[in-house]
Amino acid sequence: MNKRTTRLLMDGLISTALVVLWRAIGFEWQSTESLGVTLAIGLVPLIWLGLRHGSATAIVFAAIAGAINLILSRPEWDWITKILTEVTPLLAAGIAGVFAKYTQKTLNNRRLSSTYLNIVTASLLVSLVYFALRYVVIPIVLPAVDGLALNQLPLWGGWLATTVIASVVLILMARINQSLIIPKRSKYLSRKETSSLLND
């Protein structure tokens, strides 16, 4: 197993563990009750994974995290409901991978305003699709699943708050150390472009 694969697996396992942790403590529903908005913090590590390793990696580990979360879902739900509720919305993380190449290239070239724009756009779109699937579309298809009203704060406030949190966390990571976003031997950069990372 080469170093790139090892790093990818480690990043994927870290992201999966964080997603499952947030799900296990029931943070989304706790935030709805205590803050009045639904915060999908578990999306942050998956967006990071997509920006770092691409869509396919983000989708695979999102599916793994969702599969583990099936254990934590309501016991009265059938398997179709569990899969649609716990797995399908997390697959939105794959959208972040669309922005991986240009996030890494602009960060490597220190064009930070473009990097930040890519991060914010990825966070916004992933969060939007996740909230639309998990709290609007799936509850319409499966009435047994709790949803959120389109005209209420928990849905829209949660989407915006999740976008802001994800964007701030990922932008801070990019500012603190670009290797937190760009892996060594990144498939999105040439060997010449990654030489500085390899020498760190």
Model segments located where?
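Hydrophobic transmembrane alpha-helices
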Residues: 1-52, 56-57
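Alpha-helical transmembrane segments and their immediate interhelical/interface regions
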Residues: 9-18, 74-99
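Aromatic-anchored segments of alpha-helical transmembrane domains
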Residues: 15-26, 64-75, 123-133
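Alpha-helical transmembrane segments of multipass membrane proteins
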Residues: 20, 47-48, 67-71, 94, ...
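Membrane-embedded alpha-helical hairpins and interfacial helices in multi-pass inner-membrane proteins
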Residues: 31-36, 78-86, 99-200
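Hydrophobic core segments of transmembrane alpha-helices in multi-pass, intramembrane catalytic enzymes
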Residues: 39-46, 85-93, 165-166
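Membrane-helix interface segments
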Residues: 55-60, 111-115
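Hydrophobic alpha-helical membrane segments of integral membrane proteins
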Residues: 57-64, 84
